Regions:
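Short conserved loop adjoining the S-adenosyl-L-methionine
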Residues: 107-112, 128
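Class I SAM-dependent methyltransferase SAM/SAH-binding core
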Residues: 40-107
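A short glycine-rich, Lys/Arg-flanked "PGG" loop and its adjoining helix->strand segment in the class I
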Residues: 131-146
Length: 240
């Protein structure tokens, strides 16, 4: 799908998108965790799986000069891309408050109790060890700190044929877990005030746009069923 169109569909406003460094929006969002977080000036924020810096740069504008945003990504290529974008971000916003660190979301390069808000956008579902990810998020958050995550989750288990497809994994689908299971993972990690809000429009949009990846997965589903019967974009909010 077209990155700008997808970003608009999941709730990013045109003004924020216009200020982004070129290429920061890679069309990999399944929600708008920055908006959900209601970020405030001076906060310290970490974005898990920050990619080209899409949510990091937008969060940076919200927390202003007295705040700090740290993007964590496990791929050196993404890290290089994001760091390259910092110069343009500074020019367009006048801010110097973002950084990108190499690391895995199961082992964050961030100190204990140091973060006000943790963001993530369509990344946690890809992790092979989700319980560890949520424990790590809990570890780095300050007491009272907030989780604001958009992720893909399952409404019902995927058929084996779909789960086995490489395309399904790339499309953030094969390793996604059930909505109820997501809540259990957060509870076990120690979170409170957990609010899970399904956003079915995201998957319907992907169907409408004939995204090649989603089309390929959809063609493998049992007859009469569609992606939106199985997969939903989930807004995840919680407190430490």
């Amino acid at each position: 799908a077209d990155p700008a169109r997808l970003a608009a569909a999941v709730g990013y406003d045109a003004e924020s998108l216009a200020k982004l460094p070129d290429g920061a929006n890679m069309g990999l969002s399944c929600g708008n965790p920055v908006a959900i977080a209601a970020l405030r000036e001076g906060q310290t924020v970490v974005d898990l799986g920050s990619g080209g810096g899409f949510d990091v740069f937008q969060a940076g504008e919200k927390v202003k000069a007295s705040g700090r945003v740290i993007g964590v990504d496990m791929t050196p290529e993404m890290l290089a891309k994001a760091r390259k974008n910092i110069g343009q971000y500074r020019q367009r916003t006048g801010l110097d408050n973002v950084e990108f660190r190499l690391g895995e979301i199961e082992c964050l390069p961030v100190p204990d109790n140091s973060v006000d808000v943790v963001l993530s956008n369509c990344v946690i579902n890809l992790s092979p060890d989700k319980p560890k990810v949520w424990r790590e998020i809990y570890r780095v958050l300050k007491s009272g700190g907030k989780v604001s995550v958009s992720d893909l989750a399952l409404l019902k288990p995927l058929p084996d044929t779909v789960r086995d497809m490489a395309a399904a994994l790339v499309g953030c689908v094969a390793s996604a877990v059930l909505v109820e299971e997501t809540k259990v993972l957060l509870e076990k990690a120690g979170f409170t005030s957990i609010v899970l809000t399904p956003k079915p429009d995201y998957v319907r949009n992907m169907q409408d746009w004939n995204d090649p990846l989603y089309k390929q997965i959809a063609e493998t589903l049992p007859q009469g069923e569609e992606m939106a019967d199985y997969v939903v974009s989930l807004s995840i909010e919680a407190r430490k």
